[in-house]
């Protein structure tokens, strides 16, 4: 039976979430039913639908003791809200709550959720600290029960010297023989992150297997939101480092990076060959993947970052959204990303302009809007820079500028409408092709997702611009030749 705390959350969201009209939400990005969303959790395919749970505070548009919100979809674009799945209502999690986790299917057809359970505990010096453990909940896709054995993983299961204060974000899966495996992140004895592997025969009784990878203070400090999966003949360990220093393609603060390498299942040894940044934009964190029934590896993420969560639209009834899910592949040793192909199925009216010469600034007939799938191809040329302005009017725009001499693509939302002192500009390197560049851009009211050169690089950002600012403009220093294709979306 649902607890009083869970029933209260369900009643609140049913009343207040239903009062938010579809027009107040993005067209094809998932938002919380009401209130606050951060990390997507439990991204999975179960009983014929994609399930996306999420870190959730239904009562306000800011972080507070965590619940798990819940939504399902058949196409990864249209999301149906289900009742709140988890609340901080058990002895293992009745402090800051039910933190991030994941989902898998059990042999009896039930769905197993594994999450970080957090309680506040008084330390010998009198200080209150949050203790992080891992717990489970078992259900039918709608209601979930927490067994009395929780928590199922605690500090005693970690190697000596690892912290009980930073031990979180379990990502669970089933091996071919039915074994349950889970990777978590934890703070090692050197004060930096590590990814630890545990296994279980039944999902209840777990044992430590190995440390898959250590930060060694090379990639930030503490790690978050790990994932470990095979992809196109390689093995990927994806996670979110905190407190990164800018170096190469990595930027300050929270990043999402992927180690690409090989995994020996017999010895549980992961050998990395390459590491890359997963998104060069501003708002992208807390990734999680699932395997679709057709074999695609699909990734979701929080379309936000912690540094700008206080910059909210005035009077908003919800805050936080997830990205349009992306298909992952490996090309030339790196992960490339593409919007899920389900987006193609909702393409509507097509507007096409071929081999247009751009000198100075111009706009093109029919190319405008805040909900669209836009592709801009710039041909090789002698131009000195090319700029695309999105969500534009006389006072606002967000720009993408390409410098062919440095192969640098810059996303700038300085004029998007925010009044806060947050990050507005990010740049990333794209593959040099003598000035050639292909950009696919997903627009959805308050978000922009950019896929450069068929997803070799991506850049993601939340924008704060009035919806009336729907212009799109093209500008070049010199002479650039572009082909533009835009699809309206029938959602």
Label each PLM-derived region with a short phrase:
Residues 1-169, 174-218, 230-279, 303-353, ...:
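Beta-rich carbohydrate-recognition and catalytic domains
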Residues 10-15, 260-491:
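Beta-rich accessory regions
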Residues 229-230, 479:
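Juxtamembrane/interface motifs at transmembrane-helix termini
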């Amino acid at each position: 039976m649902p607890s009083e705390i869970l029933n209260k959350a369900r009643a609140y969201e049913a009343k207040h979430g239903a009062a938010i009209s579809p027009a107040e939400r993005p067209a094809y990005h998932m938002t919380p039913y009401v209130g606050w969303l951060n990390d997507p959790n439990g991204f999975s395919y179960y009983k014929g639908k994609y399930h996306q749970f999420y870190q959730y505070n239904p009562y306000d548009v800011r972080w507070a003791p965590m619940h798990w919100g819940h939504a399902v979809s058949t196409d990864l674009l249209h999301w149906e809200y289900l009742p709140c799945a988890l609340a901080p209502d058990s002895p293992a999690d009745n402090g800051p709550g039910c933190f991030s986790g994941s989902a898998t299917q059990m042999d009896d057809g039930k769905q197993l959720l594994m999450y970080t359970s957090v309680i506040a505990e008084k330390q010998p010096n009198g200080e209150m600290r949050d203790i992080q453990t891992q717990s489970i909940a078992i259900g039918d896709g709608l209601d979930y029960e927490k067994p009395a054995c929780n928590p199922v993983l605690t500090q005693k299961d970690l190697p000596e010297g690892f912290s009980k204060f930073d031990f979180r974000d379990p990502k669970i899966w089933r091996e071919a023989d039915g074994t349950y495996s889970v990777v978590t992140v934890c703070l090692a004895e050197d004060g930096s992150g590590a990814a630890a592997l545990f296994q279980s025969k039944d999902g209840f009784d777990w044992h430590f297997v190995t440390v898959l990878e250590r930060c060694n203070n090379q990639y930030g400090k503490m790690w978050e939101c790990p994932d470990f999966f095979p992809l196109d003949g390689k093995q990927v360990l994806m996670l979110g480092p905190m407190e990164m220093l800018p170096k190469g393609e990595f930027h300050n603060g929270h990043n999402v990076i992927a180690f690409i390498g090989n995994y020996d299942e017999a010895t549980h040894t992961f050998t990395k060959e390459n590491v890359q940044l997963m998104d060069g934009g501003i708002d992208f964190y807390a990734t999680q993947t699932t395997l679709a029934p057709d074999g695609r590896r699909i990734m979701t993420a929080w379309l936000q970052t912690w540094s700008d969560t206080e910059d909210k639209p005035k009077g908003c009834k919800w805050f936080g959204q997830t990205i349009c899910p992306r298909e992952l592949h490996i090309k030339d040793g790196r992960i490339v990303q593409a919007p899920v192909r389900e987006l193609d199925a909702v393409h509507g009216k097509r507007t096409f302009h071929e081999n247009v010469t751009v000198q100075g600034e111009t706009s093109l007939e029919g190319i405008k809007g805040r909900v669209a799938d836009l592709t801009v191809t710039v041909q090789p040329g002698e131009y000195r820079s090319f700029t695309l302005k999105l969500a534009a009017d006389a006072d606002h725009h967000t720009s993408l500028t390409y410098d062919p001499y440095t192969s640098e693509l810059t996303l700038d939302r300085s004029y998007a409408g925010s009044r806060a002192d947050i990050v507005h500009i990010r740049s990333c390197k794209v593959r040099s092709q003598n000035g050639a560049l292909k950009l696919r851009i997903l627009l959805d009211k308050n978000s922009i997702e950019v896929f450069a050169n068929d997803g070799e690089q991506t850049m993601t950002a939340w924008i704060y611009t009035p919806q009336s600012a729907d212009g799109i403009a093209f500008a070049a220093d010199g002479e650039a030749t572009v082909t533009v294709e835009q699809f309206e979306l029938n959602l």
